[in-house]
Amino acid sequence: MFLGFLLTLTLGGAGILPAADEEPPPEDPLEAALRIAYEGRKRIQEAIRDYTCILTRRERVDGRQMGYETIFVKVRHPLEEQGRVVQPFSVYVRFLRPDRVKGREVIYVEGRNGGKLIVRNGGTRFAHITTSLLPDSPAAMQHTRYPITEIGVLNLTKRLIENGEQERGNENCEAKLVQGAKINGRSCTVVQVAHKVRGEGLAYKTARILIDDELVVPVHYSAYDWPQTEGGKLVLLEEYTYTDLRLNVGLTDRDFDHRNESYLFLKSYSP
């Protein structure tokens, strides 16, 4: 009798146990986005030594909407051996547009040059001036929201993970995942996170992240504030798009040296 009861439960005759082929509940969009971001961070740290790309950005700085800037970027990730840094985090950028900053070059090598940037002014006035600046100094931060030390897809991935983990369990936060988007012809997954109600300390109303499906790295991030008027449009806070990503191109110390013959820094400058 008892054995027959067990068989009834096992076969689902009593309606207690689910069918073996019943589909699991869909993954929470925020958790799915975090899972993708964790995978991306692991891939970047383990498989991507360096890369070049084009960064297109647009930001609101001190309440003022800045125009689009297009920047050629070289990044080399840090490398440690036996607990010692043998290759520091390194960045080189050259501004391509607009004209007011065209030709500006910046180099940053973590732990070198007194922790300072080496900057060639570029643009239409005093273009050839070469100087050193702290990354977070007022002069370096004059027209941007973040220091150059935070540039790149790895830093963007880390920031997305940090923000996503903070939103876990937040009932004021809605997330959704959309497949099939394209950036520069490449297939991407869209992660959108939105806050339903304005609250103190919220950095944005809506954020959109596009993750390259093949590379598993974020290639676009944009964040919007609440409308300034009832029924108005969302206000852009920041927008960053990485295109033409070329991975593991073999960047060397020379790529992050202002004396490189292909750069326009003052070669005699001593930081």
Predicted regions and their residues:
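N-terminal mature ectodomain segment of secretory-pathway/periplasmic proteins
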Residues: 31-126
